[in-house]
């Protein structure tokens, strides 16, 4: 219990709240460099006092002196009493704030294992699909920790998105103003976004087909291109889904040991220039984006924003660089004759103005504020006037990113009759955009409007 207790209490002194299982999962999946970057911006006096007090207590209840000899009887008895009381107290208080989140991790581990084991069963469910898609290249791009309220294209006063802002009135681009994340950490959010599971259906994650599985069943060639680390402490649904792709290109070789990059995010577009055309292709790009530590993930030439809040400035620099990344991606895609659609969203936001990042334990609405926009080729626009018309009228409709699965399949012309939910398909005539029905934190919190 020593290390788990230390982690739990450290989280408490960092945030003022005990962690949830999802927070501990994120900690276990982090690396030394990322953790150091986080702590450098969040050190506090309680945390600094926590560590020496904790280890001092461990020393006092240890059974031996520094010379290896047993302490005298008067000192030994209280130590033995503490050693006996501690495990008994934990056993009698199974649901205490120190042990409960660690017990919750076991449930997540089982859910992840079940998801991996049931892949074949899910594929069998995909034999009854209908396909109306035209040949071509369909792209899904996933941002990281990007808060739409820090993007000039959505009204933020700083010039963080000069390229996207210049495209706001381009008929090939549609920007959606009321998009939110279903969770405020990457793995949980993408576990829903990239599968048929969402907050509004009763499906279990293990039974939910993934976007890659559905695309392959429809005859698409699938490609996963990522600048995030490939492995963490264990496989998650995101890494399992990625491993199902016909092609995988991992541009970050550090394998969970560092937050450094081999290349910046703009290099991912190079993979598309080398990719041969096929009849139908789905490409999923997973960027490092605005992941902490912010200064690590863009060239120094993009350190352009300066004020009396360097933490906020560094974050806005990542938004500015990512605007260039998406400009380069668009130039690459528009040069390809097979390009059809691009859908971009972020996994979650960041409560950057409050210096709270994205922690469900200390949830604030800004952690859910994300961008959503789509780009279409001339060919696609002319071939799908009804679908485009629906999207145009929905640019101010509410949407959560656990509906990516429904949205992307609709853009690709893939229909799963046994799983289709028209009320969750923003391209559908029957999309339900009633604001009050939308939730976050896996259905436990109502959405707070931007």
Q: Language-model features: where?
A:
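Active-site-proximal cap/lid insertion segments
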Residues: 231-236, 288-336, 361-370, 378, ...
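C-terminal, low-complexity/hydrophilic appendages and adjacent surface loops
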Residues: 444-450
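Active-site-proximal alpha/beta segments of enzymes that process anionic O-linked groups
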Residues: 92-140, 145-303, 396, 400-402, ...
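Metal-dependent active-site segment of extracytoplasmic phospho-/sulfohydrolases and closely related
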Residues: 139, 321-360, 405-409
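Histidine-centered active-site microenvironments of extracellular/periplasmic hydrolases
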Residues: 159, 338-339, 345-385, 422, ...
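Short, P/G- and charge-enriched loop/turn segments at secondary-structure junctions
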Residues: 126-129, 357-362, 392-393
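Transmembrane and membrane-interface helices of multi-pass
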Residues: 1-103
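A short beta-strand-to-alpha-helix junction
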Residues: 182, 202-209, 308-320, 362-368, ...
């Amino acid at each position: 219990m020593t290390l788990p207790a230390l982690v739990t209490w450290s989280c408490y002194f960092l945030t003022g709240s005990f962690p949830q299982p999802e927070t501990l999962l994120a900690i276990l999946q982090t690396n030394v460099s990322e953790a150091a970057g986080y702590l450098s911006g969040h050190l506090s006096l309680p945390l600094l006092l926590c560590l020496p007090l904790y280890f001092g207590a461990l020393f006092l209840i240890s059974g031996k002196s520094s010379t290896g000899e047993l302490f005298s009887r008067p000192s030994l008895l209280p130590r033995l009493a503490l050693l006996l009381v501690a495990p008994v107290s934990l056993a009698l208080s199974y649901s205490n704030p120190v042990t409960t989140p660690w017990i919750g991790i076991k449930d997540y581990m089982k859910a992840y294992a079940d998801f991996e084991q049931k892949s074949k069963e899910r594929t069998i469910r995909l034999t009854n699909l209908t396909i109306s898609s035209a040949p071509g290249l369909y792209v899904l791009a996933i941002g990281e920790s990007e808060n739409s309220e820090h993007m000039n294209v959505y009204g933020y006063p700083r010039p963080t998105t000069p390229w996207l802002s210049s495209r706001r009135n381009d008929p090939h681009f549609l920007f959606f103003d009321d998009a939110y994340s279903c969770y405020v950490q990457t793995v949980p959010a993408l576990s829903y976004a990239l599968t048929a599971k969402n907050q509004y259906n009763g499906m279990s994650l293990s039974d939910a087909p993934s976007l890659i599985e559905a695309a392959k069943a429809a005859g698409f060639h699938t490609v996963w291109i990522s600048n995030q680390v490939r492995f963490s402490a264990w496989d998650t649904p995101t890494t399992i889904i990625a491993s199902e792709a016909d092609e995988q290109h991992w541009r970050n070789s550090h394998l969970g040991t560092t937050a450094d990059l081999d290349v910046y995010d703009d290099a991912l577009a190079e993979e598309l220039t080398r990719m041969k055309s096929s009849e139908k292709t789905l490409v999923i790009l997973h960027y490092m984006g605005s992941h902490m530590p912010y200064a690590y993930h863009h060239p120094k030439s993009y350190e352009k924003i300066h004020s009396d809040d360097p933490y906020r400035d560094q974050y806005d620099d990542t938004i500015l660089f990512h605007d260039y990344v998406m400009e380069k991606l668009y130039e690459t895609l528009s040069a390809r004759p097979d390009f059809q659609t691009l859908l971009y969203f972020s996994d979650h936001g960041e409560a950057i103005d409050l210096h709270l990042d994205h922690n469900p334990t200390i949830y604030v609405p800004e952690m859910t504020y994300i961008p959503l926009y789509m780009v279409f080729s001339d060919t696609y626009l002319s071939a799908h006037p009804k679908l485009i018309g629906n999207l145009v009228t929905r640019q101010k409709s509410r949407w959560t990113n656990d509906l990516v699965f429904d949205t992307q399949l609709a853009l690709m012309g893939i229909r799963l009759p046994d799983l289709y939910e028209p009320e969750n398909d923003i391209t559908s005539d029957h999309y339900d955009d009633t604001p009050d029905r939308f939730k976050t934190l896996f259905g436990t919190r109502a959405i707070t409007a931007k």
